[in-house]
Regions:
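A well-ordered secondary-structure block
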Residues: 86-149, 153
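Active-site beta-strand/loop signature of hydrolases that rely on acidic residues for catalysis
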Residues: 1-2, 32-62, 105, 138, ...
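Metal-dependent phosphoesterases centered on the DNase I-like endonuclease/exonuclease/phosphatase
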Residues: 160-261
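N-terminal, active-site-proximal structural segment of metallo-dependent hydrolase catalytic domains
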Residues: 1-71, 75, 79-90, 94-99, ...
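Active-site-proximal beta-strand elements of phosphoester/diester hydrolases
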Residues: 1-22, 114-116, 137, 147-158
């Protein structure tokens, strides 16, 4: 989750108990974009799943971040919009215009790709200026077979009562099962906005702040498991600038993958960036097709 290249270590965010709506200058966003791009390039990955990528938004000074990443990585991308509003009227000063979404990047041959709508968590009129959550499906043909590698990039609900995440998680599970029954290889990855069963390394300091729910192995269809790591938190609370340690700054593990059992998980790890350029840290996954 790139945090639209505006939520680096010195930033906070009003929805998490901070006060800011956007960085003080365009230079901050440009520095973060360069830093995020360098981190991505250093991984030399076949596929990148990015969330919170702005196309045209006041909060990131109207920089087209999709174009930036494509140029920086010299790689093609597929985009699915999940936030498009001409004017978000809250708080003061307001968020203003937002157009943003999910980005899956690869140089492999893509057979097809599509946006899959997820359940909405909010009713009218709030939903008119809120995210429209979705999954971004990308299908890669497997040479010499009739199977496909199905990649699903997602960003589940954050600030609802929990019901939205449950509905969205069920829709994701149904999609996983459908593809597995078709004999495909499946990797779903992104920002769950939930932590994972058995992952409790980073203690919650303040239950009055944002506390993620938990997603359980039993929530997954047969043939799937989580691929997550807790060697470092994947996200921090934006109630203030990053302190440099997890005793004073709240950390969570809420980003990771779901992988079908016809894929061997060789390695999964959090790339510890010290939250230099965004409020999330990337999770690297290496698999082998079986």
């Amino acid at each position: 989750n790139t945090g639209y290249a505006a939520l680096s270590k010195d930033e906070d965010f009003f929805m998490d108990g901070g006060s800011k709506v956007q960085p003080d200058s365009k230079d901050v966003v440009e520095t973060n974009l360069a830093g995020i791009s360098d981190i991505l390039k250093s991984q030399n990955a076949d596929f990148y799943f990015l969330q919170e990528v702005d196309i045209d938004a006041k909060r990131s000074f109207h920089i087209n971040e999709r174009e930036y990443y494509e140029n920086a990585l010299d790689m093609s991308s597929i985009y699915a919009c999940n936030f498009k509003c001409d004017f978000v009227p809250y708080p003061i000063p307001p968020i203003g215009k937002v157009e943003a979404g999910l980005l899956t990047m690869t140089d492999y041959q893509v057979e097809s790709a599509k946006r899959i709508k997820l359940a909405e968590s909010f009713s009218w009129p709030i939903k008119t200026c809120n995210l429209k959550r979705c999954m971004l499906e990308t299908r890669i043909p497997i040479e010499g077979t009739d199977k496909e590698l199905v990649l699903i990039n997602f960003h589940l609900e954050a600030y609802d009562s929990g019901e939205g995440k449950k509905m969205q998680s069920q829709m994701l599970a149904d999609k996983l099962q459908e593809e597995y029954q078709a004999g495909n290889y499946v990797i779903a990855g992104g920002d769950f906005n939930q932590t994972f069963e058995g992952v409790d390394k980073y203690e919650i300091h303040d239950t009055d702040s944002w506390v993620p729910g938990t997603v359980y192995k039993e929530d997954l269809p047969e043939g799937f498991d989580f691929a997550v790591a807790d060697n470092a938190p994947t996200c921090r609370l934006l109630n203030g600038p990053y302190s440099g340690n997890y005793e004073d700054s709240q950390g969570y593990v809420i980003d990771g993958y779901i992988v079908s059992d016809n894929l061997q998980v060789d390695q999964v790890q959090v790339i510890d960036t010290d939250f230099e350029y965004t409020d999330h840290q990337p999770v690297s996954l290496r698999v082998t097709l079986q």
